Amino acid sequence: MTLSRVHQQVIAFPAAKTDTMSYLPDPASINNHQIPTSSKVSYLTGKGKSMLRKKKTDSFTNGARDQDKLGPKLTETVKRKLSLGAKILQMGGLEKIYKRLFKVCDQEKLFKAYQCYLSTTAGPIAGLLFISSKKIAFCSERSIKVASPQGVLSRVHYKVSIPLCKINGVNQSQNTKKPSQKYLEIVTIDNFDFWFMGFVSYQKAFNCLEKALNNDEQ
């Protein structure tokens, strides 16, 4: 199942707030897509081989095309880094924000959070990618307009949560014609695929994800 189909199946709930920069929305107002944790998979494709693999591609998928759309937005992302840091401190730190946005399991440890973009059918969405010892999770920076089945527009935060045990593969990719354009493609065992791009700290994000998957494997 492609990301476009995933996006179409997300159910929107009316937002309790309209603050377009809040990372602490009412949990009931968040646009959710969560992968259930009913099964376990191995993180090795073969003896001694990590399931995280690198690849280069000349063709553009949905995620690759979205990278081209970013353009000046990448510069804006860097400029927002300092202001985001101040906002996080004001709200009590990443740990507090993470616990407000997502259900946290017992003994779950948050490793890091990284600014990036998630590819959707509506275009790239800016937000934070959280990496913990149990899952990866994304929440959009700004609320987005979504129409209900009745046609009523409301503002919601786009949220994705993927348990590590449901990840089947992670591709570290780049455009050979534009090497600075790098992406992380995450594929679940249910054949959902998620494209993340426009990282302020791309390699650090990949290394953190690799650490999380290796720890979960043990």
Swiss-Prot record:
It comes from the Eukaryota. Residues 96-174 form the GRAM domain. Gene3D superfamilies: Pleckstrin-homology domain (PH domain)/Phosphotyrosine-binding domain (PTB). Belongs to the GEM family. PANTHER family: GEM-LIKE PROTEIN 2 (PTHR31969). This is GEM-like protein 6. It comes from Arabidopsis thaliana. The lineage of its organism: Eukaryota, Viridiplantae, Streptophyta, Embryophyta, Tracheophyta.
